[in-house]
């Protein structure tokens, strides 16, 4: 199977996962937490695989995310705990 076809399959799978997440979220509080977590983790997995297929290492993706988070922290409200917590999590991994 060609590399382009594999990338296209991963892209289609990612869109499918995001659609599934939106569907699960519309079900309200009756949704199993595992279903939400599975969608989120599967999307992250596909994005890491796609990045590798496109020639980027997992470390390069992590470093880019940290850079973007640092920039977001400097541009956003200094009290934005979501960005700060994610940045701290990524720093601890590497």
Short names for language-model regions:
Residues 1-40, 44-94:
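Flexible "arm" and connector segments at domain edges
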């Amino acid at each position: 199977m060609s590399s382009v076809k594999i990338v296209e399959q991963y892209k289609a799978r990612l869109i499918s996962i995001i659609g599934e997440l939106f569907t699960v979220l519309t079900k309200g509080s009756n949704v199993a937490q595992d279903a939400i977590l599975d969608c989120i983790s599967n999307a992250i997995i596909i994005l890491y695989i796609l990045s590798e297929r496109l020639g980027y290492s997992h470390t390069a993706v992590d470093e880019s995310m940290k850079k973007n988070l640092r920039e977001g922290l400097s541009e956003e409200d200094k009290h934005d705990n979501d960005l700060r917590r994610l940045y701290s999590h990524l720093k601890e991994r590497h």
